[in-house]
Amino acid sequence: MMTLKVCPSLLLLFLVHSVWTRTVRQVYNELDPEHWSHYTFECPQECFCPPSFPNALYCDNKGLKEIPAIPARIWYLYLQNNLIETISEKPFVNATHLRWINLNKNKITNNGIESGVLSKLKRLLYLFLEDNELEEVPAPLPVGLEQLRLARNKISRIPEGVFSNLENLTMLDLHQNNLLDSALQSDTFQGLNSLMQLNIAKNSLKKMPLSIPANTLQLFLDNNSIEVIPENYFSAIPKVTFLRLNYNKLSDEGIPPNGFNVSSILDLQLSHNQLTKIPPINAHLEHLHLDHNRIKSVNGTQICPVSIAVAEDYGLYGNIPRLRYLRLDGNEIQPPIPLDIMICFQLLQAVVI
């Protein structure tokens, strides 16, 4: 009999990833009521209502300029790729079961969102407003939200307390907006006690954001202008597992001696920065991306989380450093790979130079 061993970190990645990649059908199967027969099967003429999926309404890619009246039976509403500018209360009067709204790629502005219309959708779990014309995070929001996607808008402001009641939110995506450091205050993310993924990539940040929720597992800060990691910054987010800081302005001087020596971090991405040496890492780290920096040499003795002698004595089954993937291309390093790297990181499966 063959025994399959699953790496704990890969299992964690699978579990975290599954939270955000469930299909609509899977969510439907979990939440589907036992009987839909008491609802009439009306369908707006602009939309498509699949008989096999009676609580879904597909109005995407129809050139719509306004939201049609939503039947009471609908849980999943697809309105992406239209010309919609406003979200008013009238179309949602009967839509008391809505769980999922996709309004990506429209022309919605903050002024176009009627006051209180979103917060009245008491059962809404997933709200997609990517690729619109928003200049601030809309408020108030439904208190039961689990995912809020606001990428690729023009957001430069986050109203005070807008997230304070969103205790169930697990994912917040604000990437590719116009956020400055001043938009992220110490209490901006207060109340997001369940948050697992925070994406603030492709904004205009120069500093690490303040007061990241303590339960955050994935933090994406790529494509900003961050220069410094504050001392003990990650002690406030002790569960962070995946950290992306690619395409910033980090230098050796901007990283404290043990800035990334945090036991929870399994995947660390620092590509396209200004580093000349490899920063200290923890023994649990499995993936390290340092490509396209200014690194000229690699000293395994210096970067090994344990002494080389100890690593050599541990052997294959010992408590050795867990690094499996190391990317160093785009630097000034020439092959071959130093022997002390291989002695220290005995689980390495790939080194890209």
UniProtKB/Swiss-Prot annotation:
User: Which residues belong to the signal peptide in this entry?
Assistant: 1-21
Q: Note the segments forming the LRR repeats.
A: 73-94, 97-118, 123-143, 144-165, 168-188, 194-214, 215-236, 239-259, 264-283, 284-305
Its keywords, alphabetically, are: Disulfide bond, Extracellular matrix, Glycoprotein, Leucine-rich repeat, Proteoglycan, Repeat, Secreted, Signal
Residues of this chain annotated as glycosylated in UniProt: N94, N168, N223, N261, N299
- PANTHER family xref list: AGAP008170-PA (PTHR45712), KERATOCAN (PTHR45712:SF13)
By its UniProt entry, which InterPro entries does this protein fall under? Leu-rich_rpt, Leu-rich_rpt_typical-subtyp, LRR_dom_sf, LRRNT, SLRP
Pfam families in the cross-refs: LRR_6, LRR_8, LRRNT
Cysteines joined through disulfide linkages = C43-C49, C47-C59, C304-C344
- Protein family according to the UniProt entry: Belongs to the small leucine-rich proteoglycan (SLRP) family. SLRP class II subfamily.
Repeat among the record's keywords? yes
User: Which gene does this sequence derive from?
Assistant: KERA
Q: Name one GO cellular component term.
A: extracellular space
Protein localization: Secreted, Extracellular space, Extracellular matrix
What is the recorded function of this protein according to its Swiss-Prot or TrEMBL entry?
Plays an important role in generating and maintaining a transparent matrix within the corneal stroma.
Q: How would you summarize where this protein is expressed among tissues?
A: Cornea.
* This protein's name: Keratocan
Source species of the chain = Coturnix japonica (Japanese quail)
